[in-house]
From Swiss-Prot:
Reaction it catalyzes: 4-imidazolone-5-propanoate + H2O = N-formimidoyl-L-glutamate
The encoding gene: Amdhd1
Gene Ontology terms: biological process: L-histidine catabolic process to glutamate and formamide; L-histidine catabolic process to glutamate and formate
Cofactor(s) it depends on: Zn(2+); Fe(3+)
Name of this chain's protein: Probable imidazolonepropionase
Involved pathway(s): Amino-acid degradation; L-histidine degradation into L-glutamate; N-formimidoyl-L-glutamate from L-histidine: step 3/3
Superkingdom to which the source organism belongs: Eukaryota
Annotated positions binding 4-imidazolone-5-propanoate: 159, 192, 263
Single annotated GO MF: metal ion binding
């Protein structure tokens, strides 16, 4: 007998829908009270999409004669949407644990960068690594993210800086997209740094004349799927003009603009992003008041990275100001050799403590708003009928434990589910 549905999550103490009216993002007063059902159940169909969410008794009656491939008793537990990590650099070779010691001794990000460390160190090792080596380490990192509750990950290239290695990184992301259970959003980040021996203008020319046309060709053939274009818009890296040229080139070929801006110096990157119709801008530690207003008006998402501010001892992004002005605030781990954090629950905790976000604001920023930053909030980021059945089940009677708890989340998370299939069970 064939099952009529894939999964029933029944009798949960709480089911956190996040949204209940098909919202693509949450801002302002909508963030104060997320949609939460007490004593509820969730049904996922064989197509991997959510078929019903509602009070347990109603669901039980509605689906009484039907069968399920799997039923999970969620009594005393909470069901939340799978978490969305809106900013990661997960494909690379070359550990940089030695740089952590330098930072603790007082070296800045730019000190290390200028001494040949930082991105340059990783670039050398990533260029030398085989595709298989990169895939194996990437797969392990995704596994760690998944065990901390992440089901949709933005993944950047950017440690090649030459066409050959950038494509190698994007092929690794593409292979993972096809073979693994997590949802991935691929970002071409060839303008992550200026390669040795080139000026920023020469690097931009190379990207526009060679990298982007090749990407377009590979996308057209179905060999690669790239979603976003990224540039590190920063003093001493890519200035506003070269950033504009590269982003416009990517936009012309249908890529969403999603870039690093206003991190170490005020660059007016937020104003540029709003003008170009960017989907998202990350970092924003040094964003201007005008930039915040422009992003709110343009519905351009701010991807804030509390791990980076914490590890580099930067000033915190002004999350409260952005939230109060109506900016769509999202969160990311910024996982990279410089910020070695896999865990979105940890990111949410830091966002609450260091950036003064509330727990509902942080959860929305790590679900529906992070999905919006990737242009995927119509399919991901909330537990609503018709959306992908990505969820986590935590062994706690209130959902806030996911953020309140500082570390040890693999003990709290009992199940991780994508498209209605259990991909991790404690």
């Amino acid at each position: 007998m064939t099952s009529s549905h894939r999964l029933l999550l029944e009798n949960a103490q709480q089911v956190v829908l996040v949204c209940a009216r098909g919202e693509r993002f949450l801002t302002g007063s909508a963030l104060r009270s997320l949609a939460v059902l007490e004593g509820a159940s969730v049904v996922v169909g064989t197509d991997g999409l959510i078929k019903a969410v509602g009070p347990a008794a109603v669901i039980q009656k509605q689906f009484s004669g039907e069968t399920f491939e799997e039923r999970i008793d969620c009594s005393g537990k909470c069901v939340l949407p799978g978490l969305v990590d809106a900013h990661t650099h997960p494909v690379w070779a070359g550990e940089r644990v030695h740089e952590f010691a330098m930072k603790l001794a007082g070296a800045t990000y730019m000190d290390i960068h200028q001494a040949g460390g930082g991105i340059n160190f990783t670039v050398e090792h990533t260029r030398q690594a085989s595709e298989e080596e990169l895939f194996c380490s990437f797969q392990q990192r995704l596994q760690c993210m998944m065990r901390a509750g992440t089901t949709l990950v933005e993944c950047k290239s950017g440690y090649g800086l030459n066409l050959e290695t950038e494509l190698k990184m994007l092929r690794v992301i593409e292979r993972a997209r096809r073979e693994l259970h997590l949802s991935l959003s691929a970002t071409y980040c060839g303008a992550h740094s200026v390669p040795k021996g080139k000026t920023a203008v020469e690097a931009a020319d190379d990207i526009i004349s060679h990298h982007l046309p090749r990407l377009k060709e590979l996308s057209r053939n179905g060999d690669l799927h790239v979603d976003n274009i990224d540039v590190f818009c920063e003093k001493g890296v890519f200035d506003l003009d070269t950033t504009r040229r590269i982003l416009e080139g990517g936009k012309k070929m249908g890529l969403q603009i999603n870039f690093h801006g206003d991190e170490l110096h005020p660059m007016k990157a937020a104003e540029l992003g709003a003008e170009l119709g960017a989907q998202a801008i990350s970092h924003l530690e040094e964003v201007s008041d005008e930039g915040i207003a422009a992003m709110a008006a343009a519905r351009c998402s701010a991807v804030l990275l509390p791990t980076t501010a914490y590890m580099l001892r930067l000033k915190q992004p002004r999350a409260r100001k952005m939230l109060d002005e109506g900016v769509i605030v999202a969160l990311g781990s910024d996982f990279n050799p410089n910020a070695y954090c896999f865990s979105m629950p940890m990111v949410m905790h830091l966002a609450c403590v260091n950036m003064r976000m509330s727990m509902p604001e942080a959860l929305a920023a790590a679900t529906i708003n992070a999905a919006y930053a990737l242009g995927k909030s119509h399919t991901h980021g909330s537990l609503e009928v018709g959306k992908q059945g990505d969820a986590i089940i935590i062994n706690a009677s209130r959902w806030e434990h996911l953020i309140y708890q500082f570390g040890g989340h693999h003990e709290l998370i009992d199940y991780v589910i994508t498209k209605g299939k259990v991909i991790y069970k404690k």
